[in-house]
Amino acid sequence: MDHVSLSFLNVDENAKIVDLLFKFSANEKIQMHRHCSNYSTFTVQGELKTYYPDGSLKSVRPAGVFKAGTPGEPHTEGGGDEDVIVYFSLRPYTTTDPIYELLDENMEVVQMMNFEALQELNEEYSA
């Protein structure tokens, strides 16, 4: 996706925690997904908007807002009127359990991301 970028801050192999920054372009949405493990977010810049599967607005988190989350319903998210930068701390505490699932338009799982997958992605970004 051209309107998403990420930067790994820390991949803790002992605790199985991944900390990263996401940047979502203004007025764009990322792929529908479902969180399958605990996580937290902190909006660094802009507004993080989350949307229900029907496209209606679920929440707006402006810069400075922290949220601790647990596994939940499918949603999408993206930037408001300006690019948004969000710190995510993904906490599966295990190597193989899903952190999140990417979903298609029928809410079917098309890809599952776990600690191992993010660890590999981090290695690709670091190469």
Residue ranges and their predicted role:
Residues 13-14, 51-80:
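Short acidic-glycine-tyrosine-enriched beta hairpin
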Residues 78-127:
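Double-stranded beta-helix
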